[in-house]
Structures are given as structure tokens and as C-alpha cells.
Amino acid sequence: MKYTTAAEAVRLIQSHSSVYIQGSTSIPETLVRAMADRAGELTDVKVYSAFAVGTFDAPYCKPENRESFLVNSLFVANNIRRWLAEGYGQSIPAFLGEIPAMFRDGTLPVDVALLNLSQPNEEGYCSFGVSADLAVSAAECAHTLIGQINKAMPFSYGDAVIHISKLAAAVEVDDPLVEVPTAVPSDAERRIGSYIAEMIPDGATLQIGVGGIPNAVLAALKGHKHLGLHTEAMTDGVLPLIESGVIDNSQKSVMPGISVASLALGSRRLYDYMDYCKELVMKDVAWTNDPFRIRQNPKVMAINSAVEVDLTGQVCADSVGTRIISGVGGQHDFMYGGALSEGGKTFIAIPSTTPKGASKIKALLTPGAGVVTTRHMVQNIVTEYGVAQLRGRNLAERARALIDIAHPSVREELERAAAERYGYSFLRLKH
């Protein structure tokens, strides 16, 4: 391994090779820009881009570089959504927890991995810091590893370490990590959070995401006891519960006493908390998102969101019609693992309408919409109007329950659709 410049390091990338770019809040921007600067020298480089946040513009995905880089997105993030919609790349539909296996078995071969790493510790180990998720498996499988050694990256434990000698080239940087502002819940989101918190027992194990609704749920859990954390994404919202002892991980079966996550999305305060924190481990997403590992914890509470839900309980979470706007992430993994957990419950939490006023509960999904969580798996749908408990209910009963938590402006329309579809078995049901 040698320290060098970014321009020199990316000369290890060859035409017709495949490159994995670390994602989350950990895009190795210095290396990626240097790679894009070589567009005129490179042809047919397959790029695997992961979930990402922030304003980084993904120069490899732009039209002028279409002959140089072929973008395969493992999660359609904001920075590439426009270019993929215009045909300058494609998404790969896959459960996040299964992608590491695709790296490992060669389905998605990785020649080069571009990584954003912490400074090495005394033993020479660097940490993936805020983004173990796919980076662990990609680094394990790639023939060539190029790393940014970043002063701003926290050192996290778990699977998220690699010896600096494994790197073919390293570039020293001091690049601030992307910070995700803490979303302030709206009144509707606070009501949703309250409904969910009331259904969470003491001793539960939480899987929860980022945004207004997750923050509302977490804020409503201050009076709970002995909660655990086994989640895909670590956020600022859990810190008050950890600091107050509400989350103590004492009842977990998998890694008791320790919080488990695969990536982190938050503020510098969160990243500083993670630095050499022995009460937190960052794991390969194939490990965190394994439903059969998730189920081993007691009372798993899996809380996820959706783009839209139909009257049978089908959940679309990654597209608006045929237009892919995100990825499935770990929703399916945790909804399945949570359902299998003893005492577990799963939730799809959504405001009743979009910001533009369209109902998120529909008679039928928008044509072309992809189903992420099937109607056979969904348990509870929650809006600001209440909780529709779908587990064990027939289709007419599901329709009634979902209409009752839809926005009042669309309930009559939904009732007509349900009556036409289910006839007397729906009409006999009372509100």
C-alpha cells in the first residue's frame, strides 16, 4: 500500500472493469471525482452505486460520460435519480440484505472498490465508520481496494474494519461527512408516532428508519424500559433513548447489551458518539438484515414506510408507477424477521396523503408500481387517523380497516371501489 494523490490512485481503474462506490453518508467524493475526470480515458466501466444522501452530483452518471461509465444502481438515490430516469443508467432490483451474496458469488463481480475509511488505529486497522452495509462485502470481494483515509470518519467496531495493508492505494483527506438534519415531526406524524408507541411493549427490539415518523415514534418511547436496537440505519433519534437508559439492549438475544446497525445517517453528534464506541457495532448488511437472525430477538418492532398501499394491503415502497425513486432497502427483511419474532409486530407508517394531497391509500396501486411488502406479510398500516390491523383479516375486512384510516376526502370513493369488488361481504361491515 502507498499513500498517493487521488488522480494517481484511480489510475488503477481500467476500461471494462467494475467499480463499487461506497454509499450512505460515506461517498468517497475525492476518489469519485478523480475517477470521473478520467472519463476520456475509460470505456465501459460498470459502476455499482449504493444508497446515498447529500448533494454529491455523481459525475460518472451524467450524459456526457455515458460511454465511459455504465451505472447500475443498487438503490436509486437523489443524486442519480434524474439521470436514471433519462436512461443513463439502470437500477438492480434486490433486497439490500441479499446484495452481499451477489458480490460474494460473482453475480455482481467487483474489480475495484472505492472506500471512505477512518484513520488507522495503532494496529493498522481502518474502519468503514458510518457505512458497513455493502462496503464490507464489496471490499472482501474486490481485486483492488482504493481508500480515502478520512480524518472525519469515526472508528466503529464490528465487521466495519479493514487493515490498511489491504489497500492498493490510499489518499489522505479531511472531508466532512454528509450530515442528515433531524426531521421535526408534523402534527400528523406525531399522531402516527403515538399510535405506534402505544403498541410497543417494554423489552422490545427496534428496527426504525430516518425521518419525521421514526423520530415521532422514538420521542414517544421515553417512558419505556429495556428496549433494544437491531436496525439497518442508526440515527440521531435513538441517542436520547440510549443516553437515558431506555435503550439498554438487555433483553436482546442477538448481541445483548450492544446496539447493532449497518449504516448511520445523522449529525456530527451521532458520528462522534460512534467513534470507538464499544456499545455499538456496525455489521455487514447481510448479517443485520438476515430475517432468521432478526427473528431471534424478542418482540421485534419493525417500523417502515411506503409510497402507497392498496386496499388489500399491498405495499409499494420504491416507485411511483414505473418510475423507480429509491430502493427496497431492508424493508422486506425486517418485516419478515419481525413477523417471525416471538411477540413481534410490523408496521407500515404513512401520512394519509402526499404533500400534494393525493391519497396514499388507493383502491389499486398505480399501474407499474412494484410490491415490496406483499399483502400476505403486512400486519399493521398506520396513518394519522389510526391503525388498520390487517393480520388474519379477509380482503373485505382489510378494505374496511384501510378506508377507516384513509383521508376523509377519499373514503367515499374507496368505499365504492370496495363495494364493487367485494359486494355484500364488504357492505355488511360497519365502520
How should these model regions be labeled?
Residues 1-431:
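Conserved alpha/beta enzyme-core scaffold
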